[in-house]
C-alpha cells in the first residue's frame, strides 16, 4: 500500500519537492510504535545504497541465536527497498561513514536534491523565462559592455533576422541612417543636373528643327523669285512690287503663313471683285494671248512654266497643311492675277 501510494504521488506531481520527504515520514510513522526504533535508526544511518546487497547477505548469514533480530532487519530492509530508490536515499544520512558520525558532533545536513534533467523540466523552465525583457537587457549589456551586437539569450526575438532582406539596415544604427541620408542628398543633387541637361537638348533639337525649316524653303523661294522675274519681263506682274519684295526672305516666308493667306483672301473679297480669282486668272491669260499674237509661243511657254511651278509649290504647302488647300489656291491665284 505504501509503495503504491508513493508511486501514484510521484507520477501525479513530478515537480513536487515534498514527494521525497513523504517516504521518510511514512517509514517513521510505521516504525514509531516498534520497540526497536533506535536500532532501526542506527541501521538506517549506517545504510549505504551501493552496499545494500552486501549488507543483506551478511544479515542472512548471521547466527541462529539472533533470529528475531534478523527477522526485524529483513522486514525493514524489504520495506526500505519498496521506497523510491532514486530519490529517497539522497535524503538519508547513510552517505557519511559510521565512524565519522560517531566521532563528529556537528549535525549532518542532507545533500541537496538532484534536478531531474528530463525534457519536461527543461520545457517548463524555458516556458517560464521572459523573452522580450531578457532579450533587450542582454542586447543592451552586450552592446555597451562587450561591444557585440549578437545577444546572449536564446529567446531573443531579434536574433537571426536578415535585415538586408527586409530593408531594415537603416534602422539598425545611426551610422547607417547617416549614410542613407547622404545617398538621398546625392540623388537630389544629381537629378537637377539631368533635368537641366534634358531641356538643353530639347532646345538644341528645337533650334535644329527651326534651322532645317528655315533652310528648307530657301530653294523654293529662289524658284519663286525666278518665276516672278519671268512674269515681270512678260508684263504679267507690275514692277512696283518687286523692289519691296526682292531680297526680303521674310516677306516670302510670311506669305506662306495661314494667317497671311486668310488676310489676302479676305482683302480680295472686300475689294468687291465679282469674279472669282480663278476666273480672273483665266481672263488674264486669255487677254495676254489675244493682245500679243506674235509672242504666242513665249506666252504659252511662260504659262506652261507657271502652271508647272504652281502645283509644285502647292504640293509642298499641302504636305505641311492639307486642310488649308483652298486658302492656298486662292492666295496663289490672287498673287498671279495681280
Swiss-Prot record:
Record InterPro entries: Mbr1
Region (Disordered): 50-72, 267-318
Compositional bias annotation for Polar residues: 307-316
Stretches with biased composition (Low complexity): 50-70, 267-306
Lineage: superkingdom: Eukaryota
Function: Could influence the NAM7/UPF1 function, possibly at the level of mRNA turnover. Participates in mitochondrial biogenesis.
Family of the protein in this entry: Belongs to the ISF1/MBR1 family.
Protein name stated in the entry: Increasing suppression factor 1
Organism classification: Eukaryota, Fungi, Dikarya, Ascomycota, Saccharomycotina
